[in-house]
């Protein structure tokens, strides 16, 4: 009986040690792949920067929020550009390669001609964290090259699909001269065509120094934009690009900016 008890205790002890080791391994993996990259907020970046602000808006003084659109260019983008132009506003467009830049280079050219800010949103919209380093770099570099061919300029901003990033992605972005931009407001406009609901979700979440994420390719989004602009301006917000929100700080390659 004593031998049986000792055996049982040994098994329990081994199981406990194994569980602890597994938990430590998971924690270490998460620490290495998720949290070990540099990140800051737009406000913190501004506070550390010195000098004057280029452009007409100083977000250190104004109540700013950045407006950004993912997933274009698409057939709905020109209508959005018309709205922004009518209101004298600029936004940041994180554009995609396959099915977008490749299919609608003329629309991308207009985005640039209208003075809108252009960022990189990968070629095929994969989770970059799931790819090996070579494939992840290819997703971004191919899109950089395509944007440059059409507009003559390479972006300095990117947005990782689904907001998923890690140390590997940060390393690649630093090498390619790209700062990473996340968001604080999402209307989840990919799951609804209800423009009123999209508007409500944006207004409910918006705060000073936030970054709004919308997708101009979805049916309900562009019709919601005029109401969003009007309501935010009535609340005292100034709508700006991501770079204007950061100014006088300059986007730092590899850095993750999240409000």
Task: Show where each model-derived region lies.
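Active-site beta->alpha N-cap acidic-glycine motif
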Residues: 43-131, 135, 139, 144-146, ...
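Solvent-exposed loop/turn segments at secondary-structure junctions
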Residues: 71-75, 97-101, 118, 124-127, ...
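N-terminal export and membrane-targeting signals
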Residues: 2-21
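C-terminal domain-boundary segment and adjacent tail
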Residues: 51-59, 87, 100, 220-259
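C-terminal region of N-terminal signal peptides and the immediate post-cleavage residues
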Residues: 26-48
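Alpha-helical scaffold elements lining the catalytic groove of polysaccharide deacetylases
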Residues: 126-154, 162-208, 221-223
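Hydrophobic alpha-helical membrane segments, chiefly transmembrane helices and signal peptide h-regions
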Residues: 16-33, 117, 181-183, 206, ...
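Structural recognition of the beta-strand scaffold that forms the well-ordered cores
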Residues: 65-68, 91-95, 117-120, 156-159, ...
